């Protein structure tokens, strides 16, 4: 698995502010075969930054507006390591149909999604908009199970993974 941070020129990435268009461009950059089952997760973390997690290194030059990229193998985190995490997601639950969660349910939702992989120590979020509403979550945690965390990073969290939600980014927390 690879993690790519692609720098975008917002002036040259016209149309890429639409989730569906960005999803198609990312899929083509990773694997041009539309029937492929290659795992691909992505998130637009800022207007000038696109992050992609995929089975193969993306051909970042195929992404409209891409100016440069840093591509690295996906890191593994050992049990007991303190980490910083980041997630863009639209928290929902099935209640007959998929419905958005209220903000006071977010910490329980996150704890449930991270169960077994991470022990949550802090979480905060900012509403990004959309329907259902997307949120940018950040926080700190301790790795409980390295393999379970790797699966979360590979498969994504929550609904909307094809449209730029669900990518969990994890990095070591700097010692204090």
Residue ranges and their predicted role:
Residues 1-176:
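RNA-interacting cores
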């Amino acid at each position: 698995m690879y993690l790519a941070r692609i720098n975008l020129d917002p002036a040259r990435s016209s149309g890429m502010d639409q989730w569906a268009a960005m999803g198609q461009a990312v899929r083509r950059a990773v694997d041009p075969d539309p029937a492929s089952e290659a795992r691909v997760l992505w998130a637009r973390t800022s207007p000038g930054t696109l992050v992609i997690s995929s089975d193969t290194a993306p051909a970042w030059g195929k992404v409209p507006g891409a100016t440069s990229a840093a591509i690295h193998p996906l890191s593994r985190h050992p049990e007991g390591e303190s980490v910083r995490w980041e997630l863009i997601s639209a928290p929902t639950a099935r209640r007959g149909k998929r419905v958005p969660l209220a903000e006071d349910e977010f910490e329980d939702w996150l704890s449930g999604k991270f169960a077994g992989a991470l022990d949550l120590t802090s979480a905060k979020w900012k509403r990004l908009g959309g329907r259902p509403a997307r949120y940018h979550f950040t926080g700190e945690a301790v790795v409980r199970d390295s393999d379970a965390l790797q699966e979360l990073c590979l498969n994504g969290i929550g609904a909307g993974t094809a449209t730029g939600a669900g990518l969990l980014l994890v990095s070591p927390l700097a010692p204090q």
